[in-house]
Amino acid sequence: GLGDVYKRQAGKKVFIINCHGCKEVRFPEKEAVELQKELSAEGNVTGIMTTDYICNPENMQLRLQKHMDKIREADLVLVFSCGVGVQTIAEYLEDKMVCAACDTYPVPGFQGVTPLEYKCDQCGECYLNLTGGICPITACSKSLVNGQCGGSKNGKCEVDSEMECGWERIYRRLKEIGRLDALKCPTQIHNFATDDELK
């Protein structure tokens, strides 16, 4: 459930962001409200921001600027949105741990409104909470979820020499926010089964 996201950070101060932008994406409103009430009752919420299209950087930055005092008070930022929105927030709030509060499931042909190159594979098994807001599925050309392959050279991918190694980016990000311990967390290997195979 959504509560599992927060258990690892129990007792810490959190700022919550809700994105209601895409009609194509089902927002888990009931579960989100329940979790936010629970956290607020514990006195752990520094603030809540609800907006639309946080994947649009100009819109997102203007909205966040109004809440920066409350964000600075928080130990982490909990984002209820698709993976693209979480990555946009993580890029902007460089010194904060940004957590995805829900998994993103496939919406054929739809990827939000961001003009930036944040990518979400809509895999339904979000790894952003362990990787500092950088998706290993899309940032790594091999979609490795358990660390670097060892083949990169000078920070570049061995498969695509023009591409920066996704796991080196993840390592730098986790180091910047003081969360290298996340690399020691056990990783659930990605399930590539199709819907038909799961029936």
Regions found by a protein language model. Name each.
Residues 1-6:
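Short, small-residue-biased leader/transition segments that mark boundaries at the very start
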Residues 11-12:
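Nucleotide donor/acceptor-binding cores
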Residues 104-109:
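Short gly/pro/ser/thr-enriched loop/turn and capping motifs at secondary-structure boundaries
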